[in-house]
């Protein structure tokens, strides 16, 4: 019997969505998405434990037996207020189609290598947080360096073959041009804090969406289509944050578009902003937007070699709700439009839903159901259609420095124009089942 994947996915999403669930989460010190998964940890730099107080009260769930203590750090405290730390994450991701190549898992974001285990992130950061409460006015900074299989996906885009910033800092490239390993500097910024204001200047992670690049901040080993194909990873520019209103955070600033660095070769210029509001003690709604000129790119020499990339508009809405008893739910909707370009506008949009259950301090399980529409075939694999995925995973945290993330993922593509697109298994199939796990060690 042929399964109607589309109907099954939508039905599952409706059932999960109807059970209202997930926690209003704090992005900690990663300076990334304000609703990111795992920075509920008591130490914002290490995704060690979700808030699970409710689970051990009247809910009758498993007791805490892990004995998690203070996370071990390679560099201890100092009198300058400086934090130095990082993590190493490594794992394996494969598929049941038997495609064992450098791109066998495509178009699954960040997990394209299917023929070998990978060191995904060897990450080091140095940070001093601006402390306005103690000093009234204070300055801070942060710098992040990444090497690994996630490096090429995190580098600054928009430079073609030009070596600008960290673009093309690749340490392993095949003869076919496949970038396997590389380095990146995704964050380098200064901050100024006074009163209820915090201003960031430099290159920093986006405030948009739910998932982000740093491995400890994400429940799942793989990423949603929206995160990789529909949202920016980083911005370069200035971003102000204001917390003077009750239960409300407001952002506003100017950036060099998406994923560019300090050399704005394409001439992008966009507004980045949003608002986050705590509807209740358990529920938070966050809306963010990035809009403006997406610049232009030179594809050939001569007066006709410059292509206008038009304008960009993209917004993301994320609702998080803490059900209690260890259950939490996240709803995300993204919408993007690239307009005023040759060949017509490009549209993309989607819905993600997450359901998490923390069993105890050691174990959590989660589900992610997603639908991503690449309406014009401009974002994912060059074929217009709908991408559906259902991911099921667990997090095992044997101590405060280690996270192990196994998962299985079911993906299905439904083309829009009847052309029978096959984006999986290197262009041979319209569906695929993936599996894998990684381990993260923080320091």
Per-region residue spans from a language model:
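Surface-exposed coil loops of outer-membrane beta-barrel proteins
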Residues: 97-114, 152-189, 193-276, 286-293, ...
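Hydrophobic, lipid-facing positions within transmembrane beta-strands of outer-membrane proteins
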Residues: 120-124, 183-190, 197, 234-238, ...
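Glycine- and aromatic-enriched membrane insertion/assembly motifs of diderm outer-membrane
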Residues: 83, 109-149
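Short loop/turn motifs that connect adjacent beta-strands in outer-membrane beta-barrel proteins
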Residues: 60-61, 65-84, 97, 130-139, ...
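Transmembrane beta-strands of outer-membrane beta-barrel pores
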Residues: 90-98, 121-123, 130, 145-151, ...
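Transmembrane beta-barrel domains of outer membrane proteins
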Residues: 75, 125-129, 190-193, 239-241, ...
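N-terminal periplasmic/intermembrane-space "pro-region" immediately following the signal or transit peptide
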Residues: 2-102, 108
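Outer-membrane beta-barrel pore domains
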Residues: 108-111, 151-154, 166-170, 174-178, ...
């Amino acid at each position: 019997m042929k399964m109607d994947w589309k109907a099954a996915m939508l039905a599952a999403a409706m059932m999960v969505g109807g059970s209202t669930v997930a926690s209003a989460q704090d992005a900690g010190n990663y300076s990334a998405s304000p609703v990111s998964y795992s920075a509920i940890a008591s130490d914002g730099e290490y995704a060690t434990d979700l808030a699970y107080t409710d689970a051990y009260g009247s809910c009758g769930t498993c007791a805490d037996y892990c004995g998690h203590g203070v996370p071990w750090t390679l560099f201890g405290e100092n009198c300058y207020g400086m934090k130095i730390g990082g993590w190493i994450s490594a794992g394996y991701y494969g598929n049941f189609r038997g495609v064992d190549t450098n791109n066998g898992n495509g178009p699954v974001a960040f997990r394209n290598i299917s023929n070998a285990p990978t060191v995904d992130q060897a990450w080091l950061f140095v940070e001093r947080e601006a402390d306005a409460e103690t000093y009234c006015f204070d300055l801070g900074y942060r710098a992040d360096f990444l090497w690994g299989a996630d490096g090429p996906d995190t580098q600054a885009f928009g430079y073609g073959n030009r070596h600008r910033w960290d673009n093309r800092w690749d340490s392993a490239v095949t003869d076919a041009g496949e970038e396997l390993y590389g380095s990146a500097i995704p964050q380098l910024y200064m901050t100024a804090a006074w009163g209820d204001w915090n201003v960031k200047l430099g290159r920093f992670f986006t405030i948009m969406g739910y998932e982000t690049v740093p491995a400890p901040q994400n429940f799942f080993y793989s990423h949603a289509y929206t995160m990789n194909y529909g949202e920016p990873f980083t911005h370069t520019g200035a971003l102000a944050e204001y917390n003077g209103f009750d239960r409300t955070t407001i952002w506003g600033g100017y950036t060099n578009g998406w994923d560019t660095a300090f050399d704005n070769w394409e001439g992008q210029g966009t507004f980045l902003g949003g608002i986050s509001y705590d509807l209740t003690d358990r529920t938070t709604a966050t809306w963010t937007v990035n809009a403006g000129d997406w610049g232009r790119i030179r594809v050939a020499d001569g007066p006709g070699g410059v292509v206008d990339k038009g304008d960009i508009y993209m917004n993301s809405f994320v609702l998080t709700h803490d059900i209690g008893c260890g259950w939490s739910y996240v709803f995300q909707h993204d919408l993007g439009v690239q307009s005023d370009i040759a060949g017509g506008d490009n549209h993309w949009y989607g819905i993600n839903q997450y359901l998490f259950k923390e069993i105890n301090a050691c174990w959590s399980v989660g589900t992610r159901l997603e639908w991503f529409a690449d309406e014009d075939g401009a974002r994912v694999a060059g074929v217009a259609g709908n991408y559906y995925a259902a991911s099921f995973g667990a997090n095992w945290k044997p101590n405060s420095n280690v996270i192990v993330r196994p998962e299985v993922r079911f993906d299905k593509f439904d083309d829009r124009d009847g052309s029978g697109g096959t984006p999986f298994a290197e262009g041979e199939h319209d569906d695929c089942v993936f599996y894998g796990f990684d381990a993260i060690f923080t320091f």
